[in-house]
Amino acid sequence: MTAGEKEKSGAQWVNRFPTSRDVADLKGDFKGDFKGKVQKFLAAIEAAGGSVSISATYRPPERAYLMHYSNKIAKGKIAADKVPAMAGVDIDWVHDTEAKSKEAAQAMVKAYQIVFQPALKSRHTVGAAIDMKVGKIVGKSVKNADGTSSKIVELSDLHAVGQTYGVIKLITDPPHWSDNGR
Protein backbone atom coordinates (compact mmCIF):
# COMPACT_ATOMS: atom_id res chain seq x y z
CA MET A 1 0.00 0.00 0.00
CA THR A 2 1.14 3.51 -0.71
CA ALA A 3 0.66 6.53 1.52
CA GLY A 4 -2.96 7.60 1.57
CA GLU A 5 -4.17 4.26 0.21
CA LYS A 6 -6.85 2.54 2.26
CA GLU A 7 -6.89 -1.15 3.12
CA LYS A 8 -9.94 -3.23 2.28
CA SER A 9 -12.15 -4.36 5.16
CA GLY A 10 -11.90 -7.91 6.43
CA ALA A 11 -10.97 -10.03 9.43
CA GLN A 12 -7.37 -8.72 9.45
CA TRP A 13 -8.70 -5.51 11.05
CA VAL A 14 -9.82 -7.29 14.22
CA ASN A 15 -6.35 -7.34 15.79
CA ARG A 16 -5.94 -3.59 15.43
CA PHE A 17 -6.92 -1.08 18.11
CA PRO A 18 -7.22 -3.84 20.75
CA THR A 19 -9.57 -3.61 23.70
CA SER A 20 -7.75 -3.38 27.01
CA ARG A 21 -8.27 -5.92 29.79
CA ASP A 22 -6.35 -3.81 32.29
CA VAL A 23 -8.09 -1.97 35.14
CA ALA A 24 -5.30 0.63 34.92
CA ASP A 25 -6.80 1.79 31.61
CA LEU A 26 -10.10 2.80 33.22
CA LYS A 27 -10.69 6.48 33.96
CA GLY A 28 -9.76 7.90 37.34
CA ASP A 29 -7.44 7.04 40.17
CA PHE A 30 -7.61 4.77 43.23
CA LYS A 31 -9.19 7.47 45.40
CA GLY A 32 -12.08 8.60 43.29
CA ASP A 33 -13.20 7.79 39.83
CA PHE A 34 -14.35 4.56 38.24
CA LYS A 35 -10.91 2.94 38.20
CA GLY A 36 -10.60 3.31 41.98
CA LYS A 37 -14.10 1.98 42.54
CA VAL A 38 -13.37 -1.08 40.41
CA GLN A 39 -10.04 -1.68 42.16
CA LYS A 40 -11.75 -1.62 45.56
CA PHE A 41 -14.61 -3.87 44.40
CA LEU A 42 -12.21 -6.42 42.88
CA ALA A 43 -10.06 -6.34 46.02
CA ALA A 44 -13.18 -7.15 48.10
CA ILE A 45 -14.08 -10.06 45.82
CA GLU A 46 -10.55 -11.46 45.95
CA ALA A 47 -10.28 -10.96 49.73
CA ALA A 48 -13.45 -13.05 50.08
CA GLY A 49 -11.84 -15.84 48.04
CA GLY A 50 -13.50 -15.09 44.72
CA SER A 51 -11.82 -14.99 41.34
CA VAL A 52 -12.15 -12.42 38.57
CA SER A 53 -11.48 -12.83 34.86
CA ILE A 54 -11.55 -9.54 32.92
CA SER A 55 -12.43 -9.63 29.23
CA ALA A 56 -12.68 -5.88 28.51
CA THR A 57 -12.09 -2.48 30.07
CA TYR A 58 -11.21 0.44 27.78
CA ARG A 59 -12.22 0.07 24.13
CA PRO A 60 -10.55 2.52 21.75
CA PRO A 61 -13.10 4.54 19.71
CA GLU A 62 -11.43 3.19 16.55
CA ARG A 63 -12.28 -0.38 17.57
CA ALA A 64 -15.85 0.62 18.42
CA TYR A 65 -16.12 2.20 14.96
CA LEU A 66 -14.87 -0.97 13.24
CA MET A 67 -17.17 -3.20 15.29
CA HIS A 68 -20.20 -0.93 14.86
CA TYR A 69 -19.99 -0.50 11.10
CA SER A 70 -18.85 -4.03 10.24
CA ASN A 71 -21.98 -5.32 11.99
CA LYS A 72 -24.24 -2.76 10.29
CA ILE A 73 -22.86 -3.68 6.85
CA ALA A 74 -23.06 -7.41 7.62
CA LYS A 75 -26.73 -7.06 8.64
CA GLY A 76 -27.58 -4.94 5.59
CA LYS A 77 -28.41 -1.88 7.71
CA ILE A 78 -26.00 0.39 5.84
CA ALA A 79 -24.34 0.20 2.44
CA ALA A 80 -20.54 0.01 2.56
CA ASP A 81 -20.22 3.22 0.54
CA LYS A 82 -22.34 5.13 3.08
CA VAL A 83 -20.11 4.45 6.10
CA PRO A 84 -18.55 7.70 7.33
CA ALA A 85 -14.77 7.83 7.49
CA MET A 86 -12.96 7.97 10.83
CA ALA A 87 -9.64 9.77 11.25
CA GLY A 88 -6.84 7.30 11.89
CA VAL A 89 -8.72 4.29 10.50
CA ASP A 90 -7.65 3.83 6.88
CA ILE A 91 -10.23 1.20 5.98
CA ASP A 92 -11.97 0.83 2.65
CA TRP A 93 -15.35 -0.75 3.32
CA VAL A 94 -16.21 -0.90 -0.40
CA HIS A 95 -15.18 -4.02 -2.34
CA ASP A 96 -15.84 -4.90 -5.99
CA THR A 97 -19.47 -5.72 -5.25
CA GLU A 98 -21.91 -5.05 -2.41
CA ALA A 99 -21.96 -8.81 -1.77
CA LYS A 100 -18.15 -8.85 -1.32
CA SER A 101 -18.35 -5.81 0.96
CA LYS A 102 -20.96 -7.59 3.05
CA GLU A 103 -18.90 -10.81 3.09
CA ALA A 104 -15.82 -8.92 4.36
CA ALA A 105 -17.94 -7.26 7.05
CA GLN A 106 -19.38 -10.65 8.05
CA ALA A 107 -15.83 -11.98 8.43
CA MET A 108 -15.09 -9.09 10.79
CA VAL A 109 -18.28 -9.71 12.79
CA LYS A 110 -17.34 -13.38 13.15
CA ALA A 111 -13.77 -12.57 14.20
CA TYR A 112 -14.99 -9.96 16.71
CA GLN A 113 -17.54 -12.51 17.99
CA ILE A 114 -20.29 -9.88 17.84
CA VAL A 115 -23.67 -10.98 19.16
CA PHE A 116 -25.48 -7.63 19.63
CA GLN A 117 -25.11 -4.39 17.67
CA PRO A 118 -22.02 -2.69 19.14
CA ALA A 119 -22.42 0.91 20.20
CA LEU A 120 -20.35 3.54 18.47
CA LYS A 121 -19.95 5.30 21.81
CA SER A 122 -20.25 3.37 25.05
CA ARG A 123 -19.09 3.31 28.65
CA HIS A 124 -16.13 1.22 27.38
CA THR A 125 -14.98 3.95 24.96
CA VAL A 126 -14.79 6.45 27.82
CA GLY A 127 -13.10 4.05 30.26
CA ALA A 128 -16.15 3.65 32.50
CA ALA A 129 -17.04 -0.03 32.03
CA ILE A 130 -15.60 -3.45 32.70
CA ASP A 131 -16.63 -6.85 31.36
CA MET A 132 -15.69 -9.58 33.81
CA LYS A 133 -16.60 -13.02 35.00
CA VAL A 134 -16.62 -13.63 38.76
CA GLY A 135 -16.16 -17.14 40.10
CA LYS A 136 -15.71 -19.01 43.39
CA ILE A 137 -17.78 -16.41 45.25
CA VAL A 138 -21.09 -18.20 45.93
CA GLY A 139 -21.29 -19.18 49.60
CA LYS A 140 -18.81 -16.53 50.69
CA SER A 141 -19.22 -13.13 52.33
CA VAL A 142 -17.98 -10.02 50.55
CA LYS A 143 -17.35 -6.64 52.18
CA ASN A 144 -19.48 -3.76 50.98
CA ALA A 145 -17.88 -0.33 50.52
CA ASP A 146 -19.07 0.67 54.02
CA GLY A 147 -17.27 -2.32 55.60
CA THR A 148 -20.36 -4.43 56.30
CA SER A 149 -20.52 -7.91 54.77
CA SER A 150 -22.99 -9.46 52.37
CA LYS A 151 -23.44 -13.21 52.00
CA ILE A 152 -23.39 -14.29 48.36
CA VAL A 153 -26.01 -17.03 48.11
CA GLU A 154 -26.21 -16.72 44.32
CA LEU A 155 -24.05 -14.76 41.90
CA SER A 156 -26.72 -12.06 41.44
CA ASP A 157 -26.24 -11.12 45.14
CA LEU A 158 -22.95 -9.60 44.05
CA HIS A 159 -24.84 -6.89 42.09
CA ALA A 160 -25.87 -5.11 45.31
CA VAL A 161 -22.31 -5.31 46.63
CA GLY A 162 -20.95 -3.79 43.42
CA GLN A 163 -23.44 -0.96 43.69
CA THR A 164 -22.03 0.01 47.10
CA TYR A 165 -18.71 0.62 45.34
CA GLY A 166 -20.28 2.49 42.40
CA VAL A 167 -19.73 -0.47 40.07
CA ILE A 168 -23.19 -1.16 38.68
CA LYS A 169 -24.29 -4.35 36.91
CA LEU A 170 -26.08 -4.25 33.56
CA ILE A 171 -28.45 -7.17 34.04
CA THR A 172 -29.05 -7.77 30.31
CA ASP A 173 -25.33 -8.17 29.51
CA PRO A 174 -23.80 -10.93 31.67
CA PRO A 175 -20.19 -9.71 31.95
CA HIS A 176 -20.89 -5.94 31.87
CA TRP A 177 -20.51 -3.56 34.85
CA SER A 178 -20.16 0.22 34.61
CA ASP A 179 -20.34 3.51 36.46
CA ASN A 180 -24.02 3.95 35.58
CA GLY A 181 -25.36 0.47 34.81
CA ARG A 182 -25.42 1.03 31.04
Locate each region found by the language model.
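Cell-envelope/glycan interface and biosynthesis
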Residues: 2-171, 175-181
